[in-house]
């Protein structure tokens, strides 16, 4: 996913597993067409935890976007849709 974002020239911060970002923070913070977008990357049937839901609500309340894709294909589809939106 990081390689894909780099190939598109998209600014991003990878917080996954850094140990310093705090509990429940999204895995990726991205700027697409000037929009703040957060991604909580999920695997299998792994649902969002309560602390992750709190951060999701805070981001959305602030006007940002939050997504929880379960596959690389779903992630790419979301990013492509956002890239194609009129700014």
Residue ranges and their predicted role:
Residues 1-87:
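Catalytic phosphate/metal-binding cores of nucleic-acid and nucleotide-processing enzymes, i.e., regions
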């Amino acid at each position: 996913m990081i390689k894909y974002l780099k190939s598109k020239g998209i600014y991003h911060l990878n917080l996954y597993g850094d140990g310093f970002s705090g509990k429940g923070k999204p895995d990726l913070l991205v700027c697409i067409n000037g929009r703040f977008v957060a991604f909580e990357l999920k695997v299998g049937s792994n649902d969002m935890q309560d602390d992750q839901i709190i951060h999701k609500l805070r981001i959305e309340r602030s006007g940002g976007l939050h997504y929880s894709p379960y596959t690389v294909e779903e992630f790419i589809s979301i990013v492509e849709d956002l890239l194609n939106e009129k700014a």
